[in-house]
């Protein structure tokens, strides 16, 4: 038994160092043809309103860039103004950007200190300076509608979700009709939630992640939930309590959503954030299909995460995520769903 353990540790060490020593380009040679490289750097991809460009961050606390899908030309978006680091970028229905900025001044000793209290700003489409504050703070990623200017966000502390409309008055964006729609204030101290998407095509359901854990980690377990904005009914879409199932980008028809899950891991290796991306049916069955295998292909080093779906439902942008570091990664990839479906038929 001791020899087996030593062999396993040696093999893990070997694979880890091999993955770390490879470049993104060489790693790509191991992947199926329906993956293609967009960038060898950057993280947290976000499609624009026409699915012509992808916005992304250069690092966890950084600036926003965009890449044109056809030309692959990369340009800076937020280099025109000083800030304390941008953590989130989302594209609104009108093409303006919703930014999550961490404070007024950058602290190099603790760059992520404001990660869970981001100030909400609007940067108008085509502009590179003068973002406008909405006077609100959020934790993790907000949800935005693809058909109107409705947004929802998790209040810092991750115990409540608020919803509002963005209205432009004399060209200045403001929040209106603000209200709390979900509250966990009376729940266990180790229960959290996080917004993700309004469900197309009607936007009458908010898709979010329900977390629970313990004093050590409140996010060990997670399930994909839906909250009906008309009836108040809550639906569990994953039905897998012994694993991690964080919801990510939704498909434009509202029939599927992407999730990050560790359901492929043996039970003793679950709840350690060794995740990969899956396509989950939103029919209540809990059925999910794994679309990438980075966490087992490059164990203890890389995973696939942060998937977002374009407006046609044919392409998914995702990142090479680091196993050690929530949301962090390097390199953005394009997943061709038509090519993937064709490859399944050929098997």
Q: What residue ranges belong to the model's regions?
A:
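Bacterial N-terminal signal peptides
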Residues: 7-16
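Sequence signature of WD/YWTD-type beta-propeller architectures
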Residues: 22-347
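Bacterial Sec-dependent signal peptides at the C-terminal "C-region" and cleavage site
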Residues: 15-23
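Positively charged n-region of N-terminal signal peptides that target proteins for export
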Residues: 1-4
